[in-house]
From Swiss-Prot:
GO MF entries: DNA-binding transcription factor activity, RNA polymerase II-specific; RNA polymerase II cis-regulatory region sequence-specific DNA binding; zinc ion binding
Alphabetized Gene3D superfamilies for the sequence: 6.10.140.140, Classic Zinc Finger
Name of the gene: ZNF790
Lineage: Eukaryota, Metazoa, Chordata, Craniata, Vertebrata
Pfam families given in the database record: KRAB (PF01352), zf-C2H2 (PF00096)
Full protein name: Zinc finger protein 790
Family stated for the protein in its record: Belongs to the krueppel C2H2-type zinc-finger protein family.
Species, as recorded: Homo sapiens (Human)
Residue spans, zinc finger C2H2-type: 196-220, 226-248, 254-276, 282-304, 310-332, 338-360, 366-388, 394-416, 422-444, 450-472, 478-500, 506-528, 534-556
Amino acid sequence: MAHLMMFRDVAVDFSQEEWECLDLEQRDLYRDVMLENYSNMVSLGFCIYQPEAFSLLEKGKEPWKILRDETRGPCPDMQSRCQTKKLLPKNGIFEREIAQLEIMRICKNHSLDCLCFRGDWEGNTQFQTLQDNQEECFKQVIRTCEKRPTFNQHTVFNLHQRLNTGDKLNEFKELGKAFISGSDHTQHQLIHTSEKFCGDKECGNTFLPDSEVIQYQTVHTVKKTYECKECGKSFSLRSSLTGHKRIHTGEKPFKCKDCGKAFRFHSQLSVHKRIHTGEKSYECKECGKAFSCGSDLTRHQRIHTGEKPYECNECRKAFSQRSHLIKHQRIHTGEKPYECKECGKAFTRGSHLTQHQRIHTGEKSHECKECGKAFIRGSNLAQHQNVHVGRKPYKCEKCGKAYIWSSHLARHQRIHTGRKPYECKQCGKTFTWASYLAQHEKIHNERKSYECKECGKTFLHGSEFNRHQKIHTGERNYECKECGKTFFRGSELNRHQKIHTGKRPYECEECGKAFLWGSQLTRHQRMHTGEEPYVCKECGKSFIWGSQLTRHKKIHTDAEPYGCKKSSHIFSHHSYFTEQKIHNSANLCEWTDYGNTFSHESNFAQHQNIYTFEKSYEFKDFEKAFSSSSHFISLL
């Protein structure tokens, strides 16, 4: 009597739990194989009950639901018609060569003894040929078993072996479990091995994600007959081509009823629905974190194992996820597929484009609960919140100064390194910060809009103008708590306080000498490097400090010397024009022989040299001696 074929006789039995463990690619592959099995059964003359079950499978219905509906059994009328129908071999069915892959798919879950046309084919030589082909196929699978791709997929292959009859040719030594086909034997071995590689000697490619191994296995075993007319890409399965076409058309037929989000594949929608239900059935044994999808758990576990299977061929950098490798490779290729439609700016990642577009839309979705200030990026909000809590997480390793923003620390560190990346295009002068360069450029534009009513002096910036007015008012708002000294500017007070603390945070790496201020360290370092950035345009002579260049320029300009209004003394430089203090301030040092007084000990010592004839600096060309090295330098 002929047996009636049902969906469960062709399909691999997946429970609901097992089906949910599969990722999208594995589910699509399952549907393709089952539909191919159905096509082969029909072409060989089988009597199939409920063909609409395969139609439901093609539309995306889960196989465990189809099997559940099928348990109601066939109607008696259908069964009787199938029993009485004379099944004859189709003309020329064995005249063509039956591919091994088709035989494997037909015979994977069935031996020839359980086929419904068994009685009708008794004694037929063609039927015997099919049996021989099946056995030869099994042998071929056994011979090629070691070359086939292996991968670890417990949830896919830990299935019920529902075989009615047939010899079990392959026995697995570890458990003593038997299998009817070499492919089942190979699949079962995957449970006991953690190796994940493609065994094709010609390609030598390696993979770890299960879905890629399955897809890659299909590439090596199945001829690609379905070609996309848009881009020329070919596929071995019609459903793969159908899904691929949606990339070009943008079609997303599967829509979520809760949020309206659409997807290209039904399996993607099924995974998405778990977001709304909150279902997370896959839990990490290491940390207890749960996931809604098994593939997410697999990727997460690589954090604990440190496994990074995806390696960049350019720089050999490894990644735990393939998507991370793809994004990284864009650094080498320069590819920026995400382009802003507003300004044309391109980005390597979609998230970067999303953030950039907020500049055009003005959207600031991250709001501070303390003050209501909104930000475009969450990272900016996180840093802003440090203002309210007083937290300064960014600390300078050189001097210990801390900042709220990482950008402020980066700018501060230029003081220690001496780096001045901002250069004036007009005069070539460099600056540590962009704001300093912007202020400097106003000098060339000669925009001095702030004028002092007291003395008529003009200033570029309002802050400079305000500080200048304190000279006339005598206002000194900044007082030192240690000694009570007052200052015009807060920066002057900060520098002064270092005298009391004795802290010299700016240390020269060459000689170990420490300084109170970064500018002192910068000037000092030029002694080691020999750098002389200040060049005279008249004669080309260069100097370490700007003040030296200023003094030198007076040689070319014939500038009038500095003269004292109270006496007839004349000085070559303003820095030595201190005789005014003799007339206006207390005299600290007195020369006993001549009764002269001086406001500074250094001037007093220099004055003594006049009478003791200690002149140690001699200019050979003029044979002129000087009582001070500074006067000797000033003449140069």
